[in-house]
Amino acid sequence: MVLPGTDGAELVEALKPSRSIRLQPDVLLQGKAQRIGDDEVILYKPRWGAFYGTPLEALLRERGIDALVFCGCNFPNCPRASIYEASERDFQIAVAADAVSGIYPQGIRELERIGVTVQETAEIVSWLTSIPHQ
């Protein structure tokens, strides 16, 4: 538990594009996005899945993003919920298996059955760097 507006609720400095950025709990707790850079936003995630009760899908769609790569902490909870939510919304999905803690063989098989590509980070990075960018 953290108290909004306190140092304990802040992002780690190394993750911020600028040291002067502070979280805006009044914005985030209303379910809105806080923009902290040209391509960076912060969202408050009220449940396990990243799409539930957040503007994530709208933010991705307005940028023309239709494919997502997932990594994360504790696969059985937040990553899995977010992956299934993304699948329900027809995003193309890849999971970096070596960058997800708690992932297990049956979970990988279940993801593959719903069309998720499961690869190692190096394979995903290699593929992404081979795509011509607009």
For the regions a language model picked out, list residue spans one by one.
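Residue-level detector of anion-binding/catalytic polar loops
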Residues: D66, E88, Q92, T117
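Active-site-proximal loop->helix
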Residues: G102-V116
